[in-house]
From Swiss-Prot:
Gene (name only): Ell
Species of origin: Mus musculus (Mouse)
Predominant location: nucleus
Classification via Pfam families: ELL, Occludin_ELL
GO molecular function, one term: phosphatase binding
Protein name: RNA polymerase II elongation factor ELL
Single GO biological process annotation from the record: snRNA transcription by RNA polymerase III
Polar residues composition bias: residue spans: 332-341
Bias-annotated ranges (Pro residues): 454-470
Localization per Swiss-Prot or TrEMBL: Nucleus; Nucleus speckle; Nucleus, Cajal body
Subunit composition and interactions: Component of the super elongation complex (SEC), at least composed of EAF1, EAF2, CDK9, MLLT3/AF9, AFF (AFF1 or AFF4), the P-TEFb complex and ELL (ELL, ELL2 or ELL3). Component of the little elongation complex (LEC), at least composed of ELL (ELL, ELL2 or ELL3), ZC3H8, ICE1 and ICE2. Interacts with ICE1 (via N-terminus domain). Interacts with ICE2. Interacts with AFF4; the interaction is direct. Interacts with EAF1 and EAF2. Interacts with USPL1.
InterPro entries: E3_ELL-like, ELL/occludin, ELL_N, Occludin_ELL, WH_DNA-bd_sf
Sites of Phosphothreonine modification: 180
Length: 602
């Protein structure tokens, strides 16, 4: 197969294999012995009468490959079938076939989407190769170790005579002391050797527990790691039985993961740990011990196992947020959604933090030049960890948002509403109104739509006026005032957390409504994305030009089209904002509880 060249275009076809054809595409993972058997057959397939075959039996099966040296015999390799979408949440792949046409051109053909994976199981040859690799690693370790000469050898009994040096002149300055040179390498070895010797004196079970607590190990890797500190033959013989008691073995890759019940036996001041290892263990203990005993835990190792904690941290070392999985990002979004309790939520340290809006809405995106950060989908291990880049971060981020607002010039653009267009006044780009006008506008909103008087048109010479059929900037569901006397139901239903069972219950409620929140937010964002693009184009054009009027008319046309196809937008937006505030409240309570547990941990 010819390699694809850079800076060259190739044709990609998807029609060679029709939907009705019986072609299935799999991702196949072979062992070394299976790959050698395939290559041997490919090299001598003309001299072999038999043909390879594959047989599926449910989620398992076997592959038969003829042997060129024994034409009448075949080698059988068993395999198991797994779903890529379930095992790896990153998604599936497409199978692309490269072929050369009759004219000599290179083409690419998409055979289909790879949804299943075939993993060939290891055979005796694979285990034999693993044993040889392990023996070779032990031999290399033994060759680097020191040779101890026992007393009573062949050199015993020989005497060595030392001659005394001739008396020389005495030092003219008796009080002078000569500095003894220091060997830096030997000093480092002594300091590191003291920690290793203290680890060797500890029980073998504790040594294995504290190694598996940091990350999963294969048995061969664990043996090599234990040999660095010192390993006796008796401890080596008991390793298999010990792993069965304290670890869970993954049958796919053979990695050993420490069982959750064993984390209570760990010591944070283990002598073999570095400062980064202690920070990592502290986070792991917080995550494991905060979960209730009857909660279902994942058998896969936590993601912190793969890396050690950095000594320099942006947050103080006494607070490590177990839910934070991303760096905090400051939002430049200035207008907020409907406030809860006067727009504030209590922070863990006593300050009040401003709750960001749930996502881009028509009024937000059309009246601001900045989009709020887009909410990202949750990760598979914990949906609470990645609700939004605007939720669950430290109080300093929220204080920074309150202290440094970024007002931008706004532009009057249409917004989806539920009441007739004929009753809405003409609107232009709005400026920040005075308090009297703002309170009057809120009073008008509390009336039914048919009783509202036309709103006065603000003076803004920098933006065009929309035609009479366009609604105002503030729709029925845009910024409904929330009375400070009415406490939201979630504040009464979800008080502060006092136990791990209550934490798990809050987390379950969060997960139950988070999918609905994501769906609503995605629909709202899809509606507003087009208006945001047109708004950016309109800001770059000069008022009164042909391009300006064309873009402005396109905005109105897009608005009318979206209003016809999305009649329930106002209700969905209201529901999305409510879920945003509710989920943010639950997440904040969980973060406060975890912080209290972490500070109380000795």
């Amino acid at each position: 197969m010819a390699a694809l060249k850079e800076a060259r275009s190739y044709g990609l076809s998807c029609g060679r294999v029709s939907d009705g054809s019986r072609v299935s595409v799999f991702h196949v993972k072979l062992t070394d012995s299976a790959l050698k058997a395939f290559e041997s057959y490919r090299a001598h397939q003309d001299s072999v009468s038999l043909r390879p075959s594959i047989r599926f039996e449910g989620s398992q099966g076997h592959i038969s490959i003829p042997q060129p040296d024994c034409p009448e015999e075949v080698r059988a390799f068993s395999f198991y079938l797994s779903n890529i979408g379930r095992d790896s949440p990153q998604g599936s792949f497409d199978c692309i076939q490269q072929y050369v046409s009759s004219y000599g051109d290179v083409h690419l053909d998409c055979l289909g989407s790879i949804q299943d994976k075939v993993t060939v199981c290891a055979t005796d040859d694979s285990y034999q190769k693993a044993r040889q690799s392990m023996a070779q690693a032990e031999e290399e370790t033994r060759s680097r170790s020191a040779i101890v000469i026992k007393a009573g050898g062949r050199y015993m009994g020989k005497k060595v005579q030392f001659r005394k040096p001739a008396p020389g002149a005495a030092d003219a300055v008796p009080s002078r002391k000569r500095a003894t040179p220091i060997n830096l390498a030997s000093a480092i070895r002594k300091s590191s050797g003291s920690g290793a010797s203290s680890v060797v004196q500890r029980p073998f079970r504790d040594r294995v527990l504290h190694l598996l607590a940091l990350r999963p190990y294969r048995k061969a890797e664990l043996l090599l790691r234990l040999q660095k500190d010192g390993l006796t033959q008796a401890d080596k013989d008991t390793l298999d039985s010990l792993l069965q008691q304290v670890a869970s073995v993954n049958p796919k890759d053979g990695t050993c993961t420490l069982q959750d019940c064993m984390y209570k036996s760990l010591q944070k001041d283990w002598p073999g740990y570095s400062e980064g290892d202690r920070q990592l263990l502290k986070r792991m203990l917080m995550r494991k011990l905060c979960q209730p005993q009857n909660a279902t835990t994942d058998s896969s190792p936590p993601r912190e196992h793969g890396r050690s904690a950095s000594p320099s941290q942006k947050r103080p070392t006494d607070f490590i947020d177990p839910l934070a999985s991303k760096k905090p990002r400051i939002s430049h979004f200035t207008q907020r959604a409907q406030p809860t309790l006067n727009g504030k939520l209590g922070a863990p340290n006593g300050h009040e933090t401003l709750l960001p809006a749930p996502g881009p809405t028509p009024s937000d995106t059309l009246s601001s030049s900045h989009l709020p950060p887009r909410l990202e989908p949750p990760r598979t291990h914990d949906p609470l960890a990645d609700v939004s880049n605007d939720l669950g971060h430290s109080t300093q981020d929220y204080k920074h948002q309150e202290a440094t607002p970024a007002p931008a010039p706004h532009l009057g653009l249409p917004l989806l509403t539920d009441f007739p267009q004929a009753e809405q006044p003409t609107s232009s780009s709005h400026t920040h109104s005075r308090p009297k006008k703002k309170s009057k506008k809120h009073k008008d909103k509390e009336r039914p739509p048919e009783e509202r008087p036309p709103a006065p048109q603000p003076d803004a010479p920098t933006a065009p006026a929309l035609p009479p059929d366009a609604p105002g900037l503030n729709g029925a569901c845009d910024n409904e005032p929330t009375s400070s006397s009415e406490t939201p139901d979630y504040l009464l239903k979800y008080p502060a957390i006092s136990s791990s069972e209550q934490r798990q219950s809050y987390k379950n409620d969060f997960n139950a409504e988070y999918s609905e929140y994501r769906s609503l937010h995605a629909r709202i964002e899809q509606i507003t994305r087009r208006f945001t693009q047109l708004d950016a184009q309109l800001r770059q054009l000069s008022q009164g030009s042909d391009e300006y009027e064309t873009t402005r008319g396109q905005i109105l046309q897009e608005y009318r089209k979206i209003k016809k196809t999305n009649t329930n937008y106002s209700c969905e937006k209201r529901r999305c904002e409510y879920l945003h505030r509710k989920l943010a409240h639950i997440k904040r309570l969980i973060a406060e509880y975890d912080q209290r547990q972490l500070q109380a941990w000795p």
